[in-house]
A protein has these predicted regions:
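Alpha-helical, largely C-terminal catalytic domains
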Residues: 1-191
Length: 191
């Protein structure tokens, strides 16, 4: 029997993000998930190695790679709709859960329990870091769009920056203080 899990995961590159906004450059959930994994790994390293608090960078990065996997089946629901009210938010969480279970069902039985925590993150510390990395990735997208002259992202940048600040996560605060402004630099300025 041919299992379809990885073939379906590879289709993440066809699911676009920011569907309600005019984009200077398109972003798909595969690209986004990679950036979230890089950021989650970095945040966890900051937490562990700089702030001397427990964190598992590898688990955070792995969970981040799959954090939007359910969208292969659901598509990317725009944030204003997803969080419009508590009922819609709850219903969408249920849809995501069903989607993740469907994805797990596409794996051989012996692999399902290994992938379950990646698709249904249950460790609150890992989930918090992945959530911060997800929001940080969204903010970086806004910064890049604004840098390209796309004012469409002004409100999203402002709201996302506020949401990041309100997370009160020390590793995120450290990242924002020491790394975030570099995303506004040109290639020549980065060297």
């Amino acid at each position: 029997m041919q299992h379809r899990f990885f073939a379906l995961i590879s289709r993440m590159r066809y699911i676009g993000r920011w569907g309600l906004m005019r984009n200077t450059f398109e972003e798909n959930i595969q690209e986004h998930s990679h950036m979230v994994a890089v950021l989650a790994h970095g945040l966890a390293l900051i937490q562990r190695d700089i702030l001397h608090e427990p964190a598992d960078p590898d688990r955070c990065a792995s969970a981040a790679l799959f954090h939007d996997a359910s969208e292969i089946l659901t598509g990317d629901l725009p944030t204003p709709i997803k969080y419009y009210n508590p009922d819609i938010k709850h219903a969408y969480k249920q849809i995501e859960s069903v989607s993740c279970e469907k994805l797990l069902g596409l794996l051989p039985e012996d692999l399902r329990e290994s992938y379950r925590p990646l698709l249904h993150e249950s460790d609150p510390d890992v989930a918090r870091i992945v959530k911060a990395a997800d929001k940080l990735s969204a903010y970086i997208k806004c910064v890049e769009e604004l840098k390209a002259g796309n004012r469409e992202f002004e409100a999203a940048a402002r709201q996302t920056r506020e949401a990041l600040t309100e997370m009160h996560l020390p590793c995120l605060d450290y990242f924002m203080a020491h790394f975030l402004d570099a995303f506004q630099l040109t290639l020549d300025e980065l060297e």
